[in-house]
Design a protein with these regions (language model features):
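Aromatic- and acidic-residue-enriched carbohydrate-binding clefts of CAZyme catalytic domains
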Residues: 268-323, 330, 351-379, 386-387, ...
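The substrate-binding groove and active-site-proximal loops of carbohydrate-active enzymes
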Residues: 213-224, 303-322, 366-382, 404-421, ...
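Catalytic domains of carbohydrate-active enzymes, especially glycoside hydrolases
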Residues: 205, 229-265, 270-272, 280-302, ...
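Conserved alpha/beta catalytic core and glycan-binding cleft of carbohydrate-active enzymes
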Residues: 435-630, 643-660
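An active-site-proximal structural segment forming one wall of the substrate-binding cleft
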Residues: 234-250, 324-339, 375-399
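Hydrophobic faces of well-ordered beta-strands that scaffold small-molecule active sites
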Residues: 208-212, 256-258, 341-345, 399-401, ...
């Protein structure tokens, strides 16, 4: 292969274009035009164009001739999926050219990555010569050289703290298996509905949606594993073969919201995926060995570092190839009934791990989740929007903007933080292009403003961005983290919010099961004192079964899928009645505190039987925890010491040693950190849904699927209750020990009426159309049972039949007016 070198004339041409752009346009407009060209982009002539924004180097006076592109090209075939290997690389360093705050170059001789081969790895380096670059974290620097990673990288097979990979994204698009799906958008042949918006097709909202966490959804914990799962489901559907009970939990939806698949931070004391041997950076080229490994960080996906945001998280790539993300999307698009993919885009914050990866201009200062980003800085603003565009161009049909209320900036005149709604509007304007087709995605905002204002739970309307962007959707008030349906009186005290869903929820995401709510439900402390929260005793006999029954609940499922407006969303782990909690091993500083906050997961998610199961908790058992009760006692004491010592690890270890622990009576802070790591790794494995596949109940999963299909047969249910004069939604009051919701819906054509009654919680209650008609203007004849929860005796199927609904049971009657 050709030795990498700078092509002077081609580089000069690009610098001329760069200078003209900077001179002709205002800062933000110029940055918008430049951002699509940043990173490493293969050209038609076989060269690679490389561009970096480096304001700190320019401000510090680093001479242009001291700035180079450093490349590592493998001399042999590399398997990025290997847990660990030693690879020989040819290293080359090529000087770049400067224009304004940018360093640029057209490079000949870089190896371009594909599905089959690892491309050249690269990063920007500069000679420090004893100079300190103000405002720049230098923790990545080595041997008198500064290192600047590429924040617009397309592939980071060994993590964001390793050099990025030069990757052929255009080939990935050209070879995707769902090109026809995108080519048909906006035409009579489209497989999913779109509507015209500013001259382009905008993907229409889903009927219902499933949220999936890739690293616990399948045995492999990878996007490749999910692609295999949906390809197999598609094969069975085409062949008329029955799905297994577990497979049913994946279908019945026309959209999937994937929890974030962006590169995340790493714990530097534990995660070592790129370890070069000795080499001399002064040399322009040499050969060296590097120990590399497939990243295996554990995380929900929200601890992102912004850098390489456009690339897939290598920890969810089985092969280390970005193609896996496209393969998964294509598998869903090519199903007999296509499933749309919604990306969970978390650009509202950056983990502290981003500090050495990004220019200081990216940060406004510390925030609730690490670093608050500076959305007002023109180039940062443009780069963030470009990162969104590139990521969505993998083929997403929709975008969920995580924590939209966190996109804020400081207004000096008002002396307060202000919501940057103009930036959120820019996010909505981004146009995607896949397979040569331009389109706009379905837009969803998670926005709970004025959170974290003290009275946010009362004052949040969850409609601000819908009012600004009438085509957009938001998460509903019953979908946010603070909803805990396993607690007694939840459905009584949340009635006012559920009623809002009925009245104005047509553009809300609804449902009470998602990654946030199940976690919050597992953290609730219940007790025997008169003022302590109380779990609903009617759901199940123990707390783990109670939690499962609360989030995979026939009554609430029928409520959201068969009666109320909006787009109901379920959570795969809840569908499977599998474990879930806050899992991450990427934070050495706060890991023990995070584990302490999960103390009551032992009560809510573990049983004596599951703890002693040889499949689970091997690391905790190796530390001395032989019983669930021993673990429960220790972790609750750990939580108490966090509060008592203000999270001083050494003092915590001393206090716990005095009390005695299964780990011994002479603990150090290192022992507590080891416990935290063991907890996270064991909980991650425990939550993998492959362990719970055989436990899926045939009748229950068949019913759950029937509920979702009921919604899909009646997409008109998405409109608000009350658009037809006959429609209503209410609850029986006084409750008399039972929270009974009921409602009537009528199709737009007037050819079908549905009557729903649901015992949301409480004592058994008798219902029938005639009984409900005693208090409401409901027709009392012509009703037949359309769907009933398991256990409801509805065989008679006539309007005269009275049925008894236990807690969490519901029934739907149907009639033709």
């Amino acid at each position: 292969m050709t030795t990498p070198q700078l092509r002077p004339q081609q580089t000069a041409d690009r610098l001329d274009w760069l200078a003209e752009t900077l001179d002709e346009f205002a800062p933000f407009e110029a940055a918008q035009r430049i951002a699509p060209h940043l990173g490493a982009q293969p050209r038609d002539d076989g060269c690679v164009e490389v561009g970096f924004w480096t304001p700190a180097l320019v401000e510090a006076g680093i001479p242009a001739e001291d700035v180079s592109l450093e490349m590592f090209t493998p001399t042999e075939s590399v398997d990025p999926s290997a847990p660990e290997s030693t690879v020989e690389f040819d290293r080359h360093r090529v000087p770049l050219r400067r224009e304004g705050e940018y360093h640029w170059g057209v490079i000949e001789g870089m190896q371009i990555g594909t599905r089959e081969q690892l491309g050249s790895l690269y990063q920007l380096v500069y000679q420090k010569r004893g100079r300190k670059v103000p405002g720049r974290d230098d923790s990545l620097d080595r041997d008198g050289w500064g290192i600047v990673p590429d924040p617009l990288a397309d592939s980071v097979p060994f993590g964001v703290f390793a050099p990025a990979e030069c990757y052929d994204i255009e080939r990935l698009d050209a070879d995707r298996a769902d090109r026809e799906y995108f080519e048909a958008l906006g035409s009579d042949d489209e497989r999913v509905s779109t509507s015209e918006h500013d001259g382009l097709p905008r993907v229409e909202p889903a009927v219902s949606m499933l949220e999936i966490h890739p690293s616990t959804a399948t045995e492999s914990g990878s996007l490749a594993g999910l692609a295999r799962r949906y390809r197999e489901i598609g094969r069975k559907q085409r062949d008329g073969e029955e799905l297994t009970p577990a497979e049913r939990n994946f279908v019945g939806y026309d959209a999937i919201q994937v929890m974030p698949v962006e590169p995340i931070t790493q714990q530097h004391g534990t995660h070592h995926f790129w370890e070069p041997g000795e080499f001399d950076r002064e040399e322009a080229s040499e050969t060296l060995e590097v120990r590399v490994g497939r990243p295996d960080m554990i995380n929900w996906g929200y601890d992102i570092v912004i850098s390489a945001f456009a690339a897939p998280n290598p920890a969810v790539l089985e092969t280390g190839r970005p193609d896996e993300l496209v393969d998964f999307i294509a598998a869903c698009h090519n199903l007999p009934e296509p499933i749309k993919i919604v990306f969970d885009i978390a650009l509202g914050h950056a983990d502290d791990g981003a500090i050495p990866l990004l220019a200081d201009e990216f940060f406004e200062g510390p925030g609730m989740y690490g670093q608050h980003l500076d959305y007002q800085q023109p180039t940062v603003r443009a780069i963030l929007l470009e990162l969104q565009r590139r990521k969505m161009d993998y083929g997403a049909d929709g975008i969920r903007v995580d924590g939209a209320q966190d996109f804020r900036y400081y207004d000096a005149e008002r002396d307060e933080m202000v919501h940057d709604d103009a930036f959120l509007a820019k996010m909505d304007e981004v146009v995607q292009e896949v397979a040569g087709t331009e389109y706009r995605p379905w837009m969803i905002y998670e926005d709970g403003r004025p959170w974290p204002q003290e009275d946010w739970e009362l004052t949040s309307t969850y409609r601000t961005l819908i009012e600004q962007h009438p085509h957009s959707f938001q998460w509903s008030p019953v979908t946010f983290a603070h909803n805990t349906p396993a607690l007694l009186t939840f459905w009584a005290t949340k009635w006012w919010r559920v009623r809002e869903v009925a009245d104005m929820g047509s553009q809300w995401l609804t449902g009470v099961a998602n990654h946030d709510t199940v976690r919050r439900g597992s953290q609730v402390v219940v007790g025997d004192s008169w003022d302590a929260p109380q779990e609903n005793p009617n759901l199940a006999d123990d707390m783990p079964a109670t939690l499962d029954a609360a989030y995979n609940n026939p009554a609430s499922s029928m409520l959201f899928h068969c009666l109320l407006p909006g787009v109901p969303m379920d959570f795969l782990n809840a569908n499977m009645r599998g474990p879930w909690g806050f899992i991450r091993d990427t934070d050495d500083t706060w890991n023990v505190k995070v584990v302490a906050e999960e103390a009551y997961v032992v009560d809510w998610q573990l049983t004596d039987e599951t703890f002693v199961d040889d499949r689970f908790f091997p690391r905790l058992k190796s530390l001395g925890f032989e019983t669930r009760e021993g673990l429960r006692e220790f972790i609750q004491r750990l939580a108490d010491t966090v509060e008592a010592t203000d999270y001083h690890l050494e003092t915590m270890a001393t206090v716990l040693s005095t009390l005695g622990t299964p780990m011994g009576d002479d603990l150090s802070y290192k022992d507590l950190k080891a416990f935290g790591q063991a907890w996270m790794a064991d909980m991650h494995e425990y939550a993998n849904l492959s362990h719970w596949t055989a436990d899926q109940d045939d009748d229950r999963t068949a019913f759950d699927l029937a509920v979702r299909e009921f919604r899909h047969d009646r997409p008109w249910l998405r409109r608000d209750v009350g658009e037809a004069d006959s429609e209503l939604f209410d609850y029986r009051h006084p409750t008399r020990g039972t929270v009974l919701y009921y409602g009537l819906r009528e199709s737009p054509a007037g050819d079908e009426q549905l009557l729903v009654a649901a015992n949301m919680e409480g004592q058994p209650v008798e219902v029938s159309p005639a009984i409900l008609a005693e208090d409401e203007q409901i027709p009392d004849d012509g009703w037949e049972v359309a769907l009933a929860a398991p256990g409801v005796d509805s065989e008679a199927g006539t309007d005269a039949a009275v049925v008894e609904l236990q807690d969490s049971q519901a029934i739907i009657w149907q009639r033709e007016p």
